């Protein structure tokens, strides 16, 4: 049985012209206008990419720091010892630990947004794969969260870093701010994401790489966006 959308959603959707592809500025203005959440909703961009995710070299994954931040307070934990632990604390990590932190998570604590680890801690952190992996919290070199440069990793996480990853169908969804952001700040973040996605196009891709782009707020309808307007 198909899920029926609520009246607020339907009213919002009526304000989006069917089959119209909007320029970036108009799309952002419309998403802000039609948002009906009673909280400061997140705004997200979704890309449909022409990639074969069965091929390892076409599975995109990484991270970037948004120029205007995410509008979210990020809780960061770091698995490190010695000088690296001190550096993580100095950089503003919320929790720093070794085996004690591993055990705390094994006992069920998951009140954090980003986990960072130094390479020498990964043998211990690896035991948390079944817990952190499904939640997208497992430290990974591709997202800069397995590193000896913990200061930079903590700073990036605290200052607007977002991660991206293709799903099995070649879709990539990335948050780029809050509805309360000025349109210019949302535009700056959105352009940064689009430029990154285009830049990391796998060499093996043939034909149109970015097939579709849309943006939406947490509960709002999606608005199709012209890719060229994001790269201008």
Swiss-Prot record:
Role played: Binds directly to 23S rRNA. The L1 stalk is quite mobile in the ribosome, and is involved in E site tRNA release. Protein L1 is also a translational repressor protein, it controls the translation of the L11 operon by binding to its mRNA.
GO CC annotation terms, alphabetical: large ribosomal subunit
Subunit and interaction comment: Part of the 50S ribosomal subunit.
Coiled-coil intervals, chain numbering: none
Taxonomic path: Bacteria, Bacillati, Bacillota, Bacilli, Lactobacillales
Assigned keywords, A-Z: Repressor, Ribonucleoprotein, Ribosomal protein, RNA-binding, rRNA-binding, Translation regulation, tRNA-binding
Matching SUPFAM superfamilies: Ribosomal protein L1 (SSF56808)
A Pfam short name: Ribosomal_L1
Claim: Repressor is one of the keywords in the record: yes
Family named by the database record: Belongs to the universal ribosomal protein uL1 family.
GO molecular function: rRNA binding; structural constituent of ribosome; tRNA binding
Taxonomic source organism: Levilactobacillus brevis (strain ATCC 367 / BCRC 12310 / CIP 105137 / JCM 1170 / LMG 11437 / NCIMB 947 / NCTC 947)
Protein name: Large ribosomal subunit protein uL1
PROSITE patterns: RIBOSOMAL_L1
GO-annotated biological processes: regulation of translation; translation
Gene name of the encoded protein: rplA
